[in-house]
């Protein structure tokens, strides 16, 4: 069995070693460890491997809390201390900024920490009927596989939701369409839990009765989604209050649909908004754009600070809900929302937004390359706060801002939005030089 000394962790939380002149990425290994490993895939310049025995363990290694860790693909870093996880993610961010963007921040912000367990307020879990494995399987996908890990508990889900998993197995197993129900989406607000069942066939009256009884017994709302996300609708109870989460620091309540995009970690979301607005420093009289604004997660706190906010989002339905949230919170007088494809942004389309003193960008994993390239003398805000869920595209966009558009990267840091996983959420501040 080959042996390696692990030098560092990569962006997926794998140990990195060099053996006989070749890079080996070792799952389950930590920096500083000596491990035995098995190669499961070979490439000309690197191997992919899995640790089979830890010969010399890192002081940062901890016992995984979940019985499914190592099989389930939902988590990849439960074997690493939570503080060390954040430090590893900070290194991933700094490495990306330098190696991809050739930029370094003036300062590194302290990592934003929150609860390490029970934090996941949004999840999509798979459902499969596999008689050879005992019937219904419910869980995240297995590591490196399209198969479903059969989860009976999950410590990154809130305890009440994790505790429902055994009953959920029994419920699905009794439905007539169990083999035509590929996923269940979990969406949690401050006061309500919604389970959205993706049903590929209509339910029978008996199925609906079982689902309604489950909803009543467990204190959740059950929705059905027979088609695209827009088809999702409540089954039981009818007429329940909409899901919502609050941002108490800004006296804002955000209503949302269970299939809308919201951050999975409400505690980190609140802290990330606080950090973002500290850096953005919105003031009365300023006009600030929130690009990729979604439901108005950043827009409404900006407006609450007295600035006028212009929210832009690709989804027309989200734009309507953002405007509705602004009205509900009494902020419609300082906010406006527009639907536009920001992946096709141009100098003219940005200029059409009017004077912008500052900019907040919170794009999906693809980043905001069209937006940063479209910045010009027509639209050149003095300060940009960039919230990112992908260090590589943040670094790519930072290169354009710094090397082509005349901005300075004042600071950058991570928010541990997804503890126990390798996902890196980050924030960066750019100022016009």
Curated annotation (Swiss-Prot):
An example molecular function term from Gene Ontology annotations: iron ion binding
Gene3D superfamilies: 2.40.50.1070, Nucleic acid-binding proteins, Vaccinia Virus protein VP39
Residue ranges occupied by any TRAM domain in the UniProt entry: 1-53
Keywords assigned by UniProt, alphabetized: 4Fe-4S, Iron, Iron-sulfur, Metal-binding, Methyltransferase, rRNA processing, S-adenosyl-L-methionine, Transferase
Entries under Pfam families matching the protein: TRAM, tRNA_U5-meth_tr
Binding positions for [4Fe-4S] cluster per the UniProt entry: 66, 72, 75, 154
Membrane-traversing stretches: none
Enzyme class label: transferase
Annotated EC: 2.1.1.190
UniProt xrefs under PROSITE patterns: SAM_MT_RNA_M5U, TRAM, TRMA_1
Active-site residues per Swiss-Prot or TrEMBL entry: 389 (nucleophile)
Gene Ontology process terms (BP): rRNA base methylation
Catalytic reactions of this protein: uridine(1939) in 23S rRNA + S-adenosyl-L-methionine = 5-methyluridine(1939) in 23S rRNA + S-adenosyl-L-homocysteine + H(+)
Sites where the protein binds S-adenosyl-L-methionine: 263, 292, 297, 313, 341, 362
Annotated PANTHER family: 23S RRNA (URACIL(1939)-C(5))-METHYLTRANSFERASE RLMD, RNA M5U METHYLTRANSFERASE
NCBIfam families cross-referenced by the UniProt entry: PRK13168.1
Function as written in the Swiss-Prot or TrEMBL entry: Catalyzes the formation of 5-methyl-uridine at position 1939 (m5U1939) in 23S rRNA.
Family per similarity comment: Belongs to the class I-like SAM-binding methyltransferase superfamily. RNA M5U methyltransferase family. RlmD subfamily.
HAMAP family tied to this protein: 23SrRNA_methyltr_RlmD
The protein, known as: 23S rRNA (uracil(1939)-C(5))-methyltransferase RlmD
Lineage: Bacteria, Pseudomonadati, Pseudomonadota, Betaproteobacteria, Rhodocyclales
Gene name of this polypeptide: rlmD
């Amino acid at each position: 069995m080959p042996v390696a000394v692990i030098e560092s962790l990569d962006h997926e939380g794998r140990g990195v070693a060099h053996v006989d002149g070749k890079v080996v990425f070792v799952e389950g290994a930590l920096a500083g460890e000596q491990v035995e490993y098995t190669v499961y895939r070979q490439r000309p310049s690197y191997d992919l491997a899995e640790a089979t025995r830890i010969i010399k363990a890192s002081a940062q290694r901890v016992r995984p809390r979940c019985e499914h860790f190592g099989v389930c693909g939902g988590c990849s870093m439960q074997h690493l201390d939570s503080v060390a996880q954040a430090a590893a993610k900070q290194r991933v961010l700094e490495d990306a900024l330098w190696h991809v963007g050739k930029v370094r921040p003036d300062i590194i912000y302290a990592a934003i920490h929150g609860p390490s367990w029970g934090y996941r307020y949004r999840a999509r879990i798979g459902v499969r009927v596999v008689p050879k494995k005992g019937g219904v399987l419910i869980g995240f996908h297995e590591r490196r596989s399209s198969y479903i890990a059969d989860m009976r508990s999950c410590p990154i889900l809130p305890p009440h939701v994790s505790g429902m998993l055994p009953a959920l197995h029994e419920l699905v197993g009794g439905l007539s369409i169990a083999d035509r129900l590929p996923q269940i989406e979990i969406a949690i607000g401050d006061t309500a839990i919604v389970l959205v069942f993706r049903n590929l066939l209509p339910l029978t009256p008996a199925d609906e009765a079982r689902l309604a009884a489950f909803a009543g017994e467990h204190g959740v709302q059950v929705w059905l989604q027979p088609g695209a996300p827009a088809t999702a609708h409540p089954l039981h109870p009818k007429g329940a209050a909409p899901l919502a989460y609050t941002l108490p620091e800004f006296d804002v309540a955000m209503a949302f649909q269970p299939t809308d995009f919201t951050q999975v970690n409400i505690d980190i979301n609140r802290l990330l908004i606080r950090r973002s607005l500290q850096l953005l420093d919105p003031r009365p009289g300023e006009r600030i754009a929130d690009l990729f604004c979604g439901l108005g997660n950043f827009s409404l706190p900006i407006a609450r600070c007295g600035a006028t906010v212009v929210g832009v989002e690709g989804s027309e339905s989200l734009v309507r809900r953002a405007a509705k949230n602004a009205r509900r919170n009494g902020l419609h007088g300082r906010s406006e929302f527009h639907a536009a494809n920001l992946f096709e942004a141009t100098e003219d389309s940005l200029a059409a937004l009017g004077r912008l003193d500052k900019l907040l960008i919170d794009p999906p994993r693809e980043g905001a390359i069209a937006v940063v390239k479209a910045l010009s003398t027509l639209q050149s805000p003095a300060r940009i706060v960039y919230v990112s869920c992908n260090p590589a595209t943040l670094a790519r966009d930072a290169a354009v801002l710094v090397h082509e558009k005349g901005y300075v990267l004042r600071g950058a840091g991570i928010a541990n939005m997804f503890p126990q996983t390798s996902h890196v959420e980050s924030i960066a501040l750019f100022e016009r030089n």
